[in-house]
Amino acid sequence: YRAFFTFGKTTDTLDSFGVLVEEKDFVFDKDAMKNALKSLEGVQMQIPPAYSALSVNGVRAYTLARKGVSPDLPPRRVEIYSLDLVRQVEEKVFCIDIECSGGTYVRSICRDVAQKLGTVGYMSGLIRIASGKFSTENACTLKEVEENPESCVLPLTEPLNEFPETIVEDRFYKDLSNGVKIPTN
């Protein structure tokens, strides 16, 4: 991911769509920022944001949060492979590159970095620059799509090449079509 973190203020959703709930002083110190980012690399237990799709007793956390109820969300195991400061965009806005495991909340990373810096923060922007073997580096530009769309379309089998082929018995077709787990061997 390429994320944009704004420090010195935060919102109820930990992103730019939320309501401002707190402001706190923030003065940029490059060494402190790099140390805060480095300290979050590795395996950790991360507390998800209150505004998330996780279920709490069958109810989405964001539903509870919208009603003013703080959902009790247990920490989840995540791994942050790297957190790199790319550049300072504005006085209190920073561009950060993040490589992390699935299930990691970038909004929570921002909150946690801010806490380590003695302030508050929210995620003011997010771009997914890679997913699996797909990345923005090998993506077509809009101009390329307009000029030669066929050259920008991958075969349907391309996204699945990294997975082993599995032959499924006919009797499992309906279950598989409906997303039900089926036995494999």
Predicted feature locations:
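Short, acidic (Asp/Glu-rich) active-site segment that either coordinates a divalent metal cofactor
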Residues: Y1-D15, D72-L73, C110, T119-G125
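Acidic, low-complexity central loop/insert segments
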Residues: Y1-M45
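Short, surface-exposed recognition loops or helix-turn segments adjacent to catalytic cores
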Residues: I47-N57, G125-A130
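Extended alpha-helical targeting/anchoring segments
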Residues: S52, V56-Y81
